[in-house]
Amino acid sequence: YDLQVKLALAQDRLFGSEQVSGIAGRMEAIAAVNGAFFAATGRPLGLLMIDGELISEPYASRTALGLGPKLAVMERVGFRGEVTLDDGSRLTTLQGLNRPRLQDELILYTRQYGTTTNTNAFGLEAVVLDGEVVRIEQGNSTIPPGGFVLSAHGVQRERLGQLAVGDRLDVTV
């Protein structure tokens, strides 16, 4: 037998709900279990990584389970992210990933979040594609396929405001 353990999102999106039997059928699974906590919106509460892509950040110092081909690990994990300019200098740090932006935060939005950031106009957003800032907007930016959006408020807005269209940057989490 060639059995694998796979993770899946309800309806293949961050905000979704679906019966476990539906996910199992879509994934052609022989067994399935709901192994996550999630909000009423369907958003996972806690660390979620699928096929090497970070989908959501850790939540409230909860323990996370990591499964590899020959190893399973349970640990408390934290979140750390940085925005680095092309010259190697650090612009700022991230406060979160694929969740609503709060006061004085910088949040990274990927397509796993949806097609737009769904943020208000009190922030500043840099739309990034292939490592290059392609647009600067106030809020509710379209998240490009293969790219991401950095969304800032308050103090972080000032830092993100240093960017211009054409600037190159890298984000690490």
Kindly label every feature range from the protein language model.
Residues 1-173:
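Gly/Ser/Thr/Pro-rich low-complexity, intrinsically disordered segments
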